[in-house]
Amino acid sequence: MHKQTLSFQAEVAQLLNLVTHSLYSNPDIFLRELISNASDACDKLRFEALNDAALYEGDSELQVRLRYNKTANTLTITDNGIGLSEREAIENLGTIAKSGTRDFMAKLSGDQKNDAQLIGQFGVGFYSGFIVADRITVESRRAGLPATQGVRWSSEGTGEFEVSEMERAERGTSIILHLKDDARDYLNAWKLKGIINKYSDHISLPILMQKEEWKEGENGQPGEMVVTGEWETVNQAAALWTRAKKDITPEQYDEFYKQISYDSQAPLATTHNRVEGGTEYTQLLFIPAKAPMDLFNRDKAAGVKLYVRRVFIMDDAQALMPTYLRFVKGVVDSADLPLNVSRELLQESRAVKAIREGNTRRVLSMIEDLAANDADKFKAFYAEFGAVLKEGLGEDFANRERLAKLLRFASSTTDTVSVGFADYKARMKEGQDAIYYVTADTLAAAKSSPQLEIFRKKGIEVLLMADRVDEWALNYLHEFDGTPLQSVAKGAVDLGKLQDEDEKKAAEEAQTHFKPILDKLKEALKDKAKDVRATTRLVDSPACLVVQDGDMSTQLARMLKQAGQAVPEVKPILEVNAQHPLVKKLEAGEHFDDLAHILFDQALLAEGGMPEDPAAYVKRVNALLV
C-alpha cells in the first residue's frame, strides 16, 4: 500500500499549536465545526450532482452520523457528501492558502471567544479537532472515484501527516478523533446531543446517532446505558428558515447567525419572512452588532447565501443585496430560480431583481424600526454602518428619500452624531431657506472650520460631516423634503433674509474699497487660486478657501487622489476678511507676496490640506517672524 509522510506547511504547524494550546475557551466548538464541514460536503455533492446524478451512487439521502467507542476512545463524524481524493486530502488538510493564514493570524485579538469564531471564517475548522484529540484519522473517497481510490490521512497535530491509499466502499468522509484522556466526556450521548442541540440544530441534514437503552447490571454491578444497533435523528433536520417563526426561539436565530457569519456576538436585528406573489422566496436576514474589519472593501464577498428550493447554490450572492448593504448576513431561498443558476444569470434574472428589491426594502424597514423604536440600538447601528449606508444615496435612486431620513450627523450645536435632516429642519431659523453643512476630514476640523464663523455669530446651525464618503454622497442629494442642501464652503455665502441690509451694504463697500488689494492678491496667487474676493462669512479668521458651485471640493479631490484616481485640477477661491489685521497689513505693501502666499497656505491648512511646498511656507513664516 502506497504511503507518504509529508510535512505541514509552516503556517499550519503554527496554527495547530495555537489552536490546541491557547485559542478555544469552549472546546465544544470542535463538534460544531466538524458537523458544519460535513454539511458543506453534502451541499457540494448536491450541487455537483445537479449536472451528474451518477455522483449519488444510488444513495441520495445525505446525512451526518456520529459514533463513539468507549473502548477505543474514539469519536467518529461521518458524512456521505462529496468526499476527498488523495490530492484533495493533501491540499486541503495539509496546507492553507498563505494569504488566508496571514490574515487569520493578523486578526487574532487574544480574546478567546472572538478568536474562536475566526477558525471557521478562515476555513480551518477541521483543525479544531486537535483541541480534544491527540490524533486524527480521516478516511474518505470522492464521489465518482472507484472504491480502490479511497484515502486515509492521519496526523498527531505536530509537524507531519501521513497519507495512504485505502479501499473504501462508501462515498464521503469519516473523521476519527482519538480523544485525549481529559476529553473522555465526549464519549457520552447526552453530552453530544446537548452540543448538537445548541450549535447544530439548524443544520438541514439529519444528524444521526445510535440509540441507547438502559441495561441493568448483573451480579450486583451497576446498570449503564448501552448502544443499540438502531440509529435516530438528534437534530431538527430542517433548515431554520423553512420553519415557522413561532417555532423558532430568539436563541436559535442568534446561534444560526453566529454559525453563518462566524461572529461571536448576537445580531443587532433579525427579520424572517416568506414572500409570496410574482416571485416566491424566503428571506432570513441579520444586521450584525459590529462592523467587519473589511467593511469598506466594496469588492468583498457578500454575506447572503443563496439556496434554490433548499439546495445550496452559493455563499456570496452579490446580486441579492445592493453594495451599500454589504454588511447584512443571511439566507435567501428561492422557489423560482433554476437549480443550475449561474452568477451571470443572477445578474440578468427578473426574479433576482425582485428578490434584491424585496431584501433592500426589508433591511431598510429594520433600520427604520430601530430609528423609531430603539434609540440605543439605532445609535449602535449607525456608529458601525452609517458611513456605508450613505453610499446608497449614489447607488439606490429608488430608496434615496428613505435613506436620507436615516442619516445622522453632528452639528455646530451638538457633538453627538444624532441630528437628522428632519431634526435640523424643525430647528431652522425664521427666514432660513437652506440646510447648511460643512465637510472635513475629521469632526474636530469641521468644528473649527473658518467657514462656520458667520453662522455661529448668527446662531444658525450647521451640520458637520466628517466621513470620507460624505462629500461624494451629497453630490446625489440636493434637497431634503423640499429644502435645498447648501455647503458653507461652496459658492458665495448668501444668508438671504438672515442677513440685514447694513451687512449687505458693508460687504459691497468692502469689495469696492478693497478692490486694488484683491487685484494684487489675484496676481500674486494666479497659479493657486481661481479668484480672490472679500467675504462676510469670516469673523475671526483672515481667510478661507471655497470652491465655485458645481466644482469638486478640495477635500473630495484629496480623497480621490489618495485612492489613486485621476482628478481634474480645480483651483479654489480665496476669500479674505477685510476687517482682519493681517489682511489690513497687506495695504502697507511690505512683504506683500509672502503674506499673500501665507494667507493661502494657512487657509489650506485650516481645512485639512497641505501646502504644495511646505518648506517654502515655513521659510516665508520665519522671514516674517524675525
Swiss-Prot record:
Region (C): 559-626
B, as annotated region: 344-558
GO molecular function: ATP binding; ATP hydrolysis activity; ATP-dependent protein folding chaperone; unfolded protein binding
Cellular compartments annotated: Cytoplasm
Pfam families according to UniProt: HATPase_c_3 (PF13589), HSP90 (PF00183)
Transmembrane segments: none
Record has Thylakoid as a keyword: no
Region (A) location: 1-343
Any single Gene Ontology cellular-component annotation: cytoplasm
CDD domains, alphabetized: HATPase_Hsp90-like (cd16927)
InterPro entries, per the entry: HATPase_C_sf, HSP90_C, Hsp90_fam, Hsp90_N, Ribosomal_Su5_D2-typ_SF
SUPFAM superfamilies associated with the record: ATPase domain of HSP90 chaperone/DNA topoisomerase II/histidine kinase, HSP90 C-terminal domain, Ribosomal protein S5 domain 2-like
Keywords, sorted A to Z: ATP-binding, Chaperone, Cytoplasm, Nucleotide-binding, Stress response
Main location: cytoplasm
Tree of life domain: Bacteria
Keyword ATP-binding: yes
Family label: Belongs to the heat shock protein 90 family.
Subunit: Homodimer.
Protein function: Molecular chaperone. Has ATPase activity.
Protein name: Chaperone protein HtpG
Classification of source organism: Bacteria, Pseudomonadati, Pseudomonadota, Betaproteobacteria, Burkholderiales
Encoding gene (name): htpG
